[in-house]
Amino acid sequence: MSDSAVQRSSGRGRFITFEGGEGTGKSTQIKKLADRLKAARMRTLVTREPGGSPGAEIMRHLVLSGMGKLLGPEAETLLFAAARDDHVHTVIEPALKQGIWVLCDRFADSTRAYQGSLGSVSPGLINAMQRVTIGDLKPDLTIILDLPVEIGLQRAAARRGSGTPDRFEGEQLSFHQGLREAYRKIAADEPARCVLIDANSDPDTVAGRVWSALRDRLLPTPASVVSV
């Protein structure tokens, strides 16, 4: 399908989330996809978690600085939930109702992977918080970028330069290996929503894979449109 076919989409916006471990290239791929959608004259909003709204950005600082970790895994998860609640109700939902396509760097799957699988927070608590913070909101498509842990951490270090690793970049190698497996399990458990994409290639090649996933899942080719 050509990019012009994207313009036929109307009504409520689409919600696309990007997930993956550290250094997998989420921000790069979100920008490339946003540029392509905007070139097709689609209204597009790029946002992130934790953060994305003034209130949520305060929580982002608390979490990534490591202050949340001092409170214990459950309390840290509550900080993420508070940030998500503000983000969903002040940014994401209003944009979707206006027909805007929302591209989000991390969402609820990050809580399942980081705090659920690796942070010893019970699935029951996570599910309860999700019912309160996001209700019935669910991504139309989740792109999970997959990359060998060592390569991802090297990329993250190069991006950071001389800066201090954040709360999660500074975790042990075993943490990041477990994180990769947690994301792979999410992709395997929810194939209708999630697409696992090999991110161990140059950015343009990965961007092509992301576009193919979006086109196939959200932009089915009408009989009257000739694929190119």
Curated annotation (Swiss-Prot):
GO annotation (BP), single:
dTDP biosynthetic process
Q: Which InterPro entries match?
A: P-loop_NTPase, Thymidylate_kin-like_dom, Thymidylate_kin_CS, Thymidylate_kinase
Where does the record place Polar residues bias? Answer: 1-10
The keyword Nucleotide-binding appears for this protein = yes
| Top-level lineage group | Bacteria
Q: Which residues bind ATP?
A: 20-27
Instruction: List the CDD domains.
Output: TMPK
GO molecular function terms noted in the UniProt entry: ATP binding; dTMP kinase activity
- Map out region (Disordered) in residue numbers: 1-23
The UniProt catalytic activity note for this protein reads: dTMP + ATP = dTDP + ADP
Give its E.C. classification number.
Answer: 2.7.4.9
* Top enzyme category: transferase
Q: Write down the SUPFAM superfamilies for this protein, in alphabetical order.
A: P-loop containing nucleoside triphosphate hydrolases
One GO cellular component term, please give it.
cytosol
UniProt keywords, alphabetically: ATP-binding, Kinase, Nucleotide biosynthesis, Nucleotide-binding, Transferase
- For whether the record's keyword set contains Kinase, the answer is yes
Name the family. Belongs to the thymidylate kinase family.
Q: What does this protein do?
A: Phosphorylation of dTMP to form dTDP in both de novo and salvage pathways of dTTP synthesis.
PANTHER family (UniProt xref): THYMIDYLATE KINASE, UMP-CMP KINASE 2, MITOCHONDRIAL
Protein name (Swiss-Prot/TrEMBL): Thymidylate kinase
Q: What species is given as this protein's source?
A: Bradyrhizobium diazoefficiens (strain JCM 10833 / BCRC 13528 / IAM 13628 / NBRC 14792 / USDA 110)
